[in-house]
């Protein structure tokens, strides 16, 4: 009997990599997707050494055609996905809205919103047909309230909340479950990407506080997926201990 299958987008680092590891540890077959083929191959090797079956799909969620072709390439017994983790996402820049970079905006909107919608649209119909499945979207505390310079990124994560809530309504007459996990400060390469490789500026984001790790969010995702079928963990806000919300953080010396 085939094990359950999870598909994780943006699995080459951070929360996505953590989810791939946690679900593999929990007995799932794992489909990992991302843009970096070398990193995917490395993770696949590590997970297979632990006894997991793993398939890698290299594509950018912004490329709808590539996503469709990648999913079509899956072997027959891998085509039904029990858990979809829409993790791929990023922040770019921290400029005032009136000085924002158009390319940064496009990348955030196309990845965080349209990429998530693409994967949902391609995978969820099969879940509905089987009357079984779980969609876990990785949102953010940033979707609850805007912060200085966060304008468009915050808007994309507010959209993730609305999209997640809307999907939950759409599948309420099925046995599907839909979860929005909203992390606070997580130490990944997120800030390095936001600041276009400025590592010093990125490191300052985590200065004076013990941030969350990707594995912490992965544990929450696995908990939600492991709940009894009649239990739907609809939304979870996960913050570092010294973080009160999206903007209030106590930093030690």
Predicted regions and their residues:
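The beta1-alpha1 cofactor-binding region of Rossmann-like NAD(H)/NADP(H)-dependent oxidoreductases
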Residues: 37-38, 58-69, 102
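Residue(s) in the substrate-gating loop at a strand-loop-helix junction
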Residues: 140
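C-terminal helical subdomain
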Residues: 180-184, 188, 200-247
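Conserved glycine-rich cofactor-binding loop
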Residues: 12-14
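Active-site helix of classical SDR
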Residues: 120, 156
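Substrate-binding pocket helix/loop in short-chain dehydrogenase/reductase
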Residues: 95-97, 101-109
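Alpha-helical segment proximal to the catalytic Tyr-Lys
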Residues: 125, 169-172
């Amino acid at each position: 009997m085939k094990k359950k299958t999870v598909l994780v987008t943006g699995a080459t680092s951070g929360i996505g990599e953590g989810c791939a590891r946690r679900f593999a540890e929990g007995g799932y077959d794992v489909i990992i997707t991302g843009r970096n083929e070398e990193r995917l191959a490395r993770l696949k090797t590590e997970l297979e050494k632990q006894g997991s079956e793993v398939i890698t799909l290299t594509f950018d969620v912004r490329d709808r055609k590539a996503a469709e072709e990648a999913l079509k390439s899956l072997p027959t017994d891998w085509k039904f996905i029990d858990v979809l983790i829409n993790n791929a996402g990023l922040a770019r820049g921290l400029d005032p809205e009136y000085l924002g970079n158009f390319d940064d905006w496009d990348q955030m909107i196309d990845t965080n919103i349209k990429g998530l919608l693409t994967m949902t649209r391609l995978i969820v119909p099969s879940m509905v047909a089987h009357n079984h499945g779980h969609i876990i979207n990785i949102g953010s505390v940033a979707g609850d309230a805007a912060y200085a310079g966060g304008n468009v990124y915050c808007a994309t994560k507010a959209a993730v909340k609305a999209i997640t809530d809307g999907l939950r309504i759409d599948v309420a007459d099925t046995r599907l479950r839909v979860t929005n996990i909203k992390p606070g400060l997580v130490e990944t390469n997120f800030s390095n990407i936001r600041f276009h490789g400025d590592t010093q500026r990125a490191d300052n984001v985590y200065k004076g506080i013990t941030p969350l790790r990707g594995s912490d969010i992965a544990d929450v995702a696995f908990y939600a997926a492991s709940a009894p079928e009649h239990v739907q963990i609809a939304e979870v806000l996960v913050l570092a201990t010294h973080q009160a919300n999206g903007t209030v953080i106590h930093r030690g010396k």
